[in-house]
Amino acid sequence: KDAGIQPMADVVLNHKAAADGLEEFEVVEVDPMDRNKVLTEPFTIQGWTKFTFDGRNGAYNDFHWHWYHFTGTDYDASRNKNGIYQIQGDNKGWAHGDLVDKENGNYDYLMYADIDFKHPEVVENLDQWAEWFIETTGVEGFRLDAVKHIDSFFMKNFIHNITKKYGEDFYVFGEFWNGDTETNDEYLESIDYLYDLIDVALHQNLFRASQEGENFDLRTIFDGTLALNHPEEAVTFVDNHDTQRGQALESTIEEWFKPAAYALILLREAGLPCVFFGDYYGIEGKFAQESFQEVLDRLLWVRKDLAYGEETDYFDDPNCIGWTRSGSEESAPIACLISNNQAATKVMEIGSSYAGLTYYDVLENCSETVQVQEDGTAEFPVAERSVSVWVAQDTEGQ
């Protein structure tokens, strides 16, 4: 905080693992591909659902978790058998189908012991935990993991209580891993737009663009995205821990396109961009990836100091798109250009008041300079399968 950084916590509310003991309870086994399809009559299993936290010795509270605080689990210790087991009992069952993702019929269950957000003791305990956690750690925001698996009615009330107590500046966004436009619209409505969502559709578009190269129409890069449809609620990203190579949702943006992808999230008005640790510092091991620190530092500098003002798009060619930002009282306009095919140029307007001003590519992908003409336009180049970010030559700070 002393450095001007707002600390946030990555909060996993969906499930609990590493229980302290086994319990017996009644379940039915369901089809993994359709969790609404029951495969068995009710029977008894032994599951890891007893959480007593003996090592804490009651230091924080005396709440213990038991089988009736969960909706399901994935392992029967008595038979040494894996499966998806829906816990039976009063007011049990998955969350209502309209409150969770509809993949696999009902995607309430993800893994381990799945928390039952309908249970009043669970709701009370999590509200108390949130207050304790925020005041103990001093965090000023939450990243909510796996929200498409969590009852959205609970999430709306949970976050409402937090922001009511700690203010609207307590920033919250959710990992809602679904790229469908209508589904995102419905989810945002269901939570009353109380928190933002990661822009999965944009990531998927960036991935396709990197895979398809010149066959991808760059004019469609924002189609169906939160950045386009809900710019104030979009958390934009290029890659993350789930999409990197070797992970469950592997869809890594090809290296040749990553600088362009980051320009698209860092230098535009829409969305709150997030830079992936692995892209900045690189990744080692079996699925190694180079570091993009140098190009990211330059893009981040442009974002921080120069990427202000009205945005004008030049999305007029399937293989070459550009945009300008009109600048501020302290900074001249900037221009960005992306090509997924051959080298190209595009005439874009900077403003007649900047006539004679010389521009250079801060990414150094183009070595020449460009001068703004008397009419306020300039013809900016971009190299083959590349990105260029053009800034005024007398700009300080880089």
For the regions a language model picked out, list residue spans one by one.
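Active-site-proximal helices and loops of the catalytic beta/alpha 8
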Residues: 1-9, 14-15, 24-64, 128-398
